[in-house]
Amino acid sequence: FLYYHGGGYSMGSPESHYSLVSYLADISGTTVYVPDYRLGPENKYPAQLDDGVKTYMSLINDFGYSHNQIAIGGDSAGGNLALITLLKLKELNANLPSSVALLSPWADPSGSGESYTEDMADRDILLGPIMKNVWKNDDELYHFYIDEKDVDKKNALMFPLGGDYKNCPPI
């Protein structure tokens, strides 16, 4: 299982997610790989996507796994990275992973979807306080990892909610 950690692309690490991924390894009986991908604001998009694809391909080319033996996933920004990695692999006509497992994926970093409401913020103990602060300050969290000049909200490799997942593995 290739698991991309969350942290808004600006924090988090394999170590910060040790407890979670250890639990996932225990209940699944499989090895869980957690790459230490580059973070913002020092490393801007597409550094994270490049690292996501490179790590997946390394499991195949360097470690001898078949794509059918690999599931990818992640939480929050790691869920975003799993989705954009999947879409990039599809674009490259690469062999896709067997499945994708997501925990509260950051599929719409712009926060422009209908599900981002004040009501949701009151119910979501993880993201609620963050979203309220973002709305209050009219801020965009994705600026931690995407340069303003590069933002393209229609690009599914940045904002995967609108991606084409036809012929992709189960998500």
Describe these PLM feature segments:
Residues 1-171:
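Alpha/beta-hydrolase superfamily serine-hydrolase fold, recognizing
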